[in-house]
Amino acid sequence: MKSGRRGGQNWAPSRQAPASAESDVALRHVRRAEELFRRKAKEPLTLAEAAACAGCSVRALQLAFRRCRGMTPMAALRRMRLEAARAGLADGPTSIRAIAAAYRFTNPGRFARLFKEVFGQSPSELRQAQDRTTG
């Protein structure tokens, strides 16, 4: 009877890719999804759409983002949208509510809370600081 082990090791060929190859593939998936996020930051996006664009399954994209960015794909999209909204706040007089809505934040209070968590100041505090430096 064969045991499937030879010399204490499994002799069957490994089905896992080397770690560096897995990392390269994961990073490629992440970068494709991030490019989609940048192009369509103001449009509704689903995780399934991001995975299709990246050329992988939803689960593979989730794992790739966790490995490469330390966050979920949707958290990365939210972060990109917040960064774009921050740039929009710096660009001119458009209302905070309009900028938030443009980047798919439909609840102004939640937008302000997330913004402050990420940037350390609320959108209105950012505006006030800009007014002091430019005015």
Which residue ranges define each predicted feature?
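Short, Lys/Arg-enriched, Trp-marked, Pro/Gly-tolerant hinge/linker segments that flank
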Residues: 2-35, 39, 53, 67-72, ...
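Small/flexible residues
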Residues: 7-8, 17, 61, 83, ...
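Basic/polar phosphate-binding segments, predominantly the helix-turn-helix DNA-binding elements
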Residues: 11-14, 47-76, 100-122
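Terminal helix-turn-helix DNA-binding modules in bacterial transcription factors
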Residues: 31, 35, 39, 44-49, ...
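Short beta-strand "wing" residues that participate in macromolecule-binding interfaces
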Residues: 125
